[in-house]
Every structure is written in structure tokens, then in C-alpha cells.
Amino acid sequence: MNASNWSVYLILCENSAFYCGISPNPQQRLAIHTAGKGAKYTRVFKPVAMRIVAGGMDKGTALKQEIAVKKLTAAQKRQLWEQAEKMPSET
């Protein structure tokens, strides 16, 4: 596994809130969340869509970015969502 292939993603949940996470394989991680086997939050509030907000980084940098995104307000996360890269399943 390449050390620089980690991504930070946002998931739009059915309650219109955002869930933030990191993964070296966001498509696979979305499948896990959608199957109800991911984070507790996405088991309760099902994923609707996912977008990549940052990519091509090592795990440590991705973790720092994730923490920064989680500290954003809902409005700031919405703005980040609008600017983020759409997943192929969303086009």
C-alpha cells in the first residue's frame, strides 16, 4: 500500500449531517458504511453520498486534516462539500 494514498472524505447522511473520515480506499469505505458495518454514526444515519475533500497524503497528514474538518461548523462543512470532488457514483 502506498503511504501517500490516504484521502479525507465527507459523507452526507440521511439526516442532512456530515460524517468525516479517512481511508486509503474511499469507495470500499463507503460500501462498508452503506452496509451498516462502518462507524456507529453511519449505522444510525445512513449514508446518502460521499465526496473526497482531500487526497494523496500519508495517514498522519490525513488524520490531522480529518480533525480540522471535524472542527468546522455545519455551514463550513457544507461549503467544503460543494467544492469537493464528486464520487463516480454521484455523477
UniProtKB/Swiss-Prot annotation:
All residue ranges annotated as the GIY-YIG domain in the record: 4-83
Q: Which CDD domains match?
A: GIY-YIG_UPF0213
Q: Which InterPro entries does the entry mention?
A: GIY-YIG_endonuc, GIY-YIG_endonuc_sf, UPF0213_domain
Gene3D superfamilies, per the entry: GIY-YIG endonuclease (3.40.1440.10)
One Pfam match, given by its short name, reads GIY-YIG
Q: Which PANTHER family match?
A: UPF0213 PROTEIN YHBQ
User: Family assignment?
Assistant: Belongs to the UPF0213 family.
What is the protein's given name? UPF0213 protein NGO_1598
- State the species of origin: Neisseria gonorrhoeae (strain ATCC 700825 / FA 1090)
